[in-house]
């Protein structure tokens, strides 16, 4: 064997060593990641725990079982039709045990944003949700538009007023509490606020500021003050895009339930960590993998 041939063979062998060493390292890293304990569960509400005033199958008992594990529980929701207190009362009325501090909603995040930015918005939100926001300053012109789920407010004159506020000054903000395409009611799917947000964007030539899911900050802020990394958390939800894809993009595990607004033709990319029939089965999976 010549010196040149020997040197070439050495390089090939060295490449193989590096290849298999890296392959083993990556594999070990993946296994370690999968075996990391679940320390927190972020749970969607509408469509996951309940549909209107009806809990999903065995959801009330499943939540009790999950609490017994000691896992941190936060309810992360884009629900914007009602104030946090009204939402809390309604959930308790249908059997769920939870505290107001456990609800992390896009509505409350939007309230904090309005306060922080010292805005004087025109609100396209329900009358009940409006009570969470600070009062308008009648001495100042409106300088922004806040949009939530407000079926009774989405009529032409209101939308036209919002359009003109945005059009009057390029610095006026369009704040989308969330951009849901649709949500689940007892009588089927219904339009969410997303189409109205996009309509205002198109007509006024502006881009909205998204507050709720799937905003990365919204998921991370649910864990504020907790010594828990996103890799130790699961997100349970019915919305393929906002719940599952949004959470997994941040680094959480995603448990897709087939209740609520779930549609089999809407596929998550990347796929969810696991897909189950309902919230109760999601809890079973967590108990098996804790």
Where are these regions (language model features)?
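Non-catalytic pre-domain segments flanking phosphatase-related domains
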Residues: 2-7, 13-43
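Asp-based, Mg2+/Mn2+-dependent phosphohydrolase catalytic module
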Residues: 33-43, 50-69, 82-104, 108-290
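Conserved phosphate/oxyanion-binding catalytic-loop motifs
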Residues: 79
């Amino acid at each position: 064997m010549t010196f040149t041939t020997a040197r070439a063979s050495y390089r090939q062998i060295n490449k193989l060593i590096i290849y298999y060493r890296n392959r083993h390292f990556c594999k070990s890293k993946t296994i370690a990641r999968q075996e990391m304990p679940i320390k927190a569960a972020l749970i969607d509400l509408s469509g996951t725990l309940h549909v209107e005033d009806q809990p999903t199958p065995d959801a009330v008992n499943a939540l009790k079982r999950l609490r017994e594990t000691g896992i941190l529980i936060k309810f992360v929701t884009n629900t914007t039709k009602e104030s946090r207190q009204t939402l809390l009362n309604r959930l308790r009325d249908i059997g769920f045990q939870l505290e107001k501090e456990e609800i992390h909603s896009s509505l409350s995040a939007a309230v904090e944003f309005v306060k922080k930015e010292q805005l004087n918005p025109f609100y396209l939100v329900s009358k009940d949700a409006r009570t969470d926001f600070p009062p308008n300053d009648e001495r100042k012109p409106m300088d922004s538009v806040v949009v939530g789920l407000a079926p009774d407010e989405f009529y032409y004159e209101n939308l036209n007023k919002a359009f003109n506020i945005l059009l009057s000054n390029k610095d006026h903000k369009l704040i989308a509490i969330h951009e849901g395409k649709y949500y689940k009611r007892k009588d089927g799917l219904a339009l969410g606020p997303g189409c109205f947000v996009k309509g205002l964007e198109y007509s006024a030539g502006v881009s909205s500021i998204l507050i709720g899911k799937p905003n990365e900050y919204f998921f991370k802020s649910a864990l504020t003050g907790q010594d828990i990394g996103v890799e130790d958390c699961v997100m349970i939800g019915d919305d393929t895009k906002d719940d599952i894809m949004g959470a997994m993009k941040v680094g959480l595990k995603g448990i897709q339930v087939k209740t609520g607004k779930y549609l089999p033709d809407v596929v998550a990319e990347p796929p969810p960590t696991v897909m189950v029939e309902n919230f109760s089965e999601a809890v079973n999976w967590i108990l098996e993998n804790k």
